[in-house]
Swiss-Prot record:
Its EC number is 2.6.1.-. One of its GO terms (molecular function) is pyridoxal phosphate binding. Belongs to the class-I pyridoxal-phosphate-dependent aminotransferase family. Pathway: Mycotoxin biosynthesis. Keywords: Aminotransferase, Pyridoxal phosphate, Transferase. Aminotransferase; part of the gene cluster that mediates the biosynthesis of swainsonine (SW), a cytotoxic fungal alkaloid and a potential cancer therapy drug. Swainsonine production occurs via a multibranched pathway and is dispensable for fungal colonization of plants and infection of insect hosts. The first step of swainsonine biosynthesis is the production of the precursor pipecolic acid (PA) via conversion of L-lysine (Lys) to 1-piperideine-6-carboxylate (P6C) by the aminotransferase swnA, the latter being further reduced to PA by the reductase swnR. InterPro entries: Aminotransferase_I/II_large, Class-I_PLP-dep_aminotransf, PyrdxlP-dep_Trfase, PyrdxlP-dep_Trfase_major. This is Aminotransferase swnA. GO terms for biological process: aromatic amino acid family catabolic process; lysine biosynthetic process via aminoadipic acid; tyrosine biosynthetic process. Gene3D superfamilies: Type I PLP-dependent aspartate aminotransferase-like (Major domain). Its cofactor is pyridoxal 5'-phosphate. Pfam families: Aminotran_1_2 (PF00155). The keyword Lipid biosynthesis does not apply.
Length: 493
């Protein structure tokens, strides 16, 4: 069976290599228009429209009308007249950064007022340019809009595309926020098997080829976290993405690419921010980043979600979504009557940082600094795992992106293991989790992320970015190792 699986996988990859030029997709020309997705829209999308009251504000006129139509308090009633922000030394920003009444580009009166659902024009333009430079989507009519973070964006996209009772596709282990959002909307999740490169193309193709349409219509939304996958830390290779994209084309899937860890690379050199010619720091960054589904997308079937939460601060509640203009327009209609655009003060902070202070070069330097810090922490945690987790019982893979280690514990090594004990994995997970907490370390249970129960292994996710103290990385792993060893009655080091 395993050999048949590998042969099928090899055939699929050969098929992909014949149809997708992995190296040149970025620069293929001429670019076509995106597909239309009317046949993939939910009932809610078909009934959703733009707010006529808010649209009235956008109506172009030759002069500024007297504003008596929309209930927007005039700026003279706001209790603030300026904002001042000071960046850290590592951010290398122009300090202080201020926002006052009457500033030409983005004054505080605009920041504190209701805003267009796409967000600040200047800030959106910055993220759109970043997307063009890094991903260069190979079709014409793509666009970018702001979001209130990835979780909010994913929630809206699921509402846009799916009706209650539908199924979506996702990795066998995936982000809990998406699982909860799907369940809240009455959706089911079909798990797709994974290997050391992430999603398995053959399993995805087989699940779709042999889907039982008597239970529901065939899934057409694939949710994936391709870089520094949460929770496993896996990063999909370009060849793997190309294989998955080929299947998406074959089965007319929409790919929801959730990529908050894309910029957090953990391999390479981070020793200096001074980049010698011929490459700028941004160009060097671009060449070091993984490919994306968006960069392979010729038909507009990828909906890419980026976030500032993992690279700046989660409290900003701001990110950006890139997709075909049709999808972006529908997304903005949903956002307008839902979460609306991100907070105005958050947009001001990002505008001052990205547009007025950093630019693309400064952004690249910041990511270089952040990735270097995270790489050092990852290396400390990997060394601690090698020293303190029971050998032969615990395994893990060194991540090349992101912020997580996925610890796998072999359940068959437990003295009470029996194939007939269906609940042993969850029972043991609970005991290790509680014992670790009693020893003073908090970890994440693997079952929180698993779409379907795993009966022969126990998993825990740990992160190397949450603590401010480097010593906590080794001490935390040491305490987790003690909890595992005690629950397994394991005396070997």
């Amino acid at each position: 069976m395993h050999l048949e699986f590998e042969k099928a996988h090899d055939v699929l990859l050969e098929d992909v290599r014949d149809t997708v030029n992995i190296r040149q997709t970025h620069f293929s020309s001429p670019k076509r228009l995106a597909n239309r997705w009317d046949h993939r829209l939910s009932d809610e999308s078909l009934s959703q429209g733009a707010s006529p009251l808010k649209n009235s504000v956008k109506t172009a006129t030759t002069s500024v009308p007297i504003p008596l139509g929309v209930g927007r308090p005039a700026s003279l009633f706001y209790p603030w007249q300026s904002m001042t922000m000071t960046g850290t030394k590592e951010s290398n920003t122009r300090n202080p950064m201020t926002c006052n009444i009457g500033e030409a580009a983005f004054d505080i009166s605009s920041a504190l007022n209701y805003a267009d659902p796409s967000g600040s024009t200047e800030l959106v333009a910055c993220f759109r340019e970043n997307t063009r430079l890094i991903h260069n989507p190979p079709y014409q009519d793509w666009d970018t809009t702001l979001t209130c973070g990835s979780t909010s964006a994913i929630d809206i996209v699921l509402r846009m595309l799916c009706n209650r009772g539908d199924w979506i596709l996702a990795e066998a282990s995936t982000y809990t926020g998406t699982v909860m959002a799907a369940k809240a909307h009455g959706l089911n999740i079909q798990s797709i098997e994974m290997d050391e490169e992430g999603l398995l193309p053959v399993d995805l193709d087989n699940k779709l080829r042999y889907w039982d349409t008597s239970r529901s219509r065939k899934p057409f939304v694939l949710y994936t976290i391709p870089s520094g996958h949460n929770p496993t830390g896996i990063t999909q290779s370009t060849a793997r993405k190309a294989a998955i994209y080929q299947i998406a084309e074959r089965h007319d899937l929409l790919v929801l690419e959730d990529d908050p860890y894309f910029f957090l690379r953990l391999d390479g050199s981070f020793s200096s921010l001074d980049i010698n010619p011929p490459y700028s720091s941004f160009e060097k960054l671009r060449k070091s980043l993984p490919s994306s589904y968006l960069s392979l997308d010729k038909s507009g079937r990828v909906i890419r979600v980026d976030s500032t939460s993992k690279i700046l601060a989660p409290g900003l509640r701001c990110g950006w979504l890139t997709a075909s203009k049709q999808i972006v327009e529908i997304f903005e209609n949903f956002a307008e009557v839902g979460p609306a655009p991100p907070s105005g003060p958050s947009q001001v902070m990002l505008y001052k940082l990205f547009v007025e202070s950093w630019g693309q070069e400064g952004f690249a330097n910041w990511l270089n600094h952040l990735s270097g810090e995270y790489k050092s922490r990852r290396d400390i945690m990997i060394a601690a795992c090698s020293q303190h987790l029971p050998k032969g019982l615990c395994t893990w893979t060194t991540p090349t992106h992101g912020m997580f280690l996925w610890i796998t514990i072999d359940l068959a090594r437990h003295p009470d293991y029996s194939e007939k004990r269906e609940n042993l994995s969850l029972d043991l997970e609970d005991k290790i989790y509680e014992r670790a907490a009693s020893y003073g370390v908090a970890v994440a249970k693997g079952s929180w992320f698993n779409v379907e129960a795993c009966l022969d292994k126990v998993f825990f996710r740990i992160t190397f970015v949450s603590t401010t103290c480097l010593d906590d990385l080794e001490n935390g792993v040491k305490r987790l190792g003690a909890a595992v060893r005690d629950e397994f009655r394991f005396t070997q080091a």
